[in-house]
Amino acid sequence: MNNIRKGDEVIVLTGRDKKRRGTVLARVDADHVLVEGVNVVKKHVKANPMANNPGGIVEKTMPIHVSNVALFNPATGKGDRVGVQEVDGRKVRVFRSNGAVVGAKA
């Protein structure tokens, strides 16, 4: 069971975007995620008339390693570690600090 999934709200722990919050857009592979508004770089794109691409400088969200983000716990207002517990015969993710189920409405 993955600790961080698409749609989760995370907080960045290290790097240029430290303490910035965002939503996970995609899981690139087992170790990297795309986070909305985090690790945005400017890429120079060559024009391609066949694909109707004018080219120029484009802002693109780049992947960030999962070890550099933590799931945001709204109860504490901080990043938190995640554990797995069995509730009603199903495995669910829970915050380690307070035991609340991840994604449950308060």
From Swiss-Prot:
Pfam families: ribosomal_L24. PROSITE patterns: RIBOSOMAL_L24. Signal peptide: none annotated. The keyword Iron-sulfur does not apply. GO terms for cellular component: ribonucleoprotein complex; ribosome. Keywords: Ribonucleoprotein, Ribosomal protein, RNA-binding, rRNA-binding. The keyword RNA-binding applies. It comes from the Bacteria. GO terms for biological process: translation. One of its GO terms (molecular function) is structural constituent of ribosome. Part of the 50S ribosomal subunit. NCBIfam families: rplX_bact. This is Large ribosomal subunit protein uL24.
